[in-house]
């Protein structure tokens, strides 16, 4: 049950992958300003969560079946939820400026919507033999 990749050449053509990759870059810039004592705490946790999002999208895209692809997208979705919680915590601890926090929350919500839509579209497609 292979999944069709339609007109996309590779996972880097997916809008949700592009958006989540851009979020990775932004998160790395922001967390670079976190206090040194957070290096192995919240900084590390946030970075792991955000990197997991585009990484699992890419891995899922490379899988052989639609079922595997969807499973990896759900893992990415879980990472988005994890990241959102960590970003809220960092904001409440005043580690992220209010303006940056608002932008991050908006970007995270958009990625969440995009992932839900992609998952739904794949779940509603008939599987190839």
Positions of PLM-derived features:
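Short, C-terminally biased terminal segments at protein or domain edges
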Residues: 1-59, 63-129
